[in-house]
């Protein structure tokens, strides 16, 4: 049974050394998997933050890594990447991996068992981290701004305010130094007790209130 990829991005690592455990061809091109990586992959179930980019190298040879992805392999050997993964995390019989996509076929030196150096694009990682932090702060500011529009308790966010974010957020796309979130004001939100009519009527005022709270 293969082992899951050991990840170190949570500790802020940008570099590492590891052994290539498999090289696969998929709908995303050539995917290199290593035993341990500092690369942060895009989450295929909630793809808010893009995966890290960077390089794999060995003895003067270098290949570029496109956006790192989630991958998985079954006990029977089925390999899948990103949205093609047919199961949820935690399902027995599957091992979870980080895939490093490269352009074209793998060069002759990039084979199973090879030792490689991994390097993440640091400025891009930092920009995405700032964008992710700003996204969370903005959502908390929005929850504060919309707190009086709830007629029922929707549950609380991390600051104890009514959690509009959790109820209405449909998608979040983080980019360097920012993010774009989309919200749905549908029947389910109204049934949950949110006053969508007042929200629409006072959108301009709420916008400036949210900006003020965010800046504060």
Predicted regions located by residue number:
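Active-/binding-site microenvironments in catalytic and ligand-binding cores
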Residues: 1-216
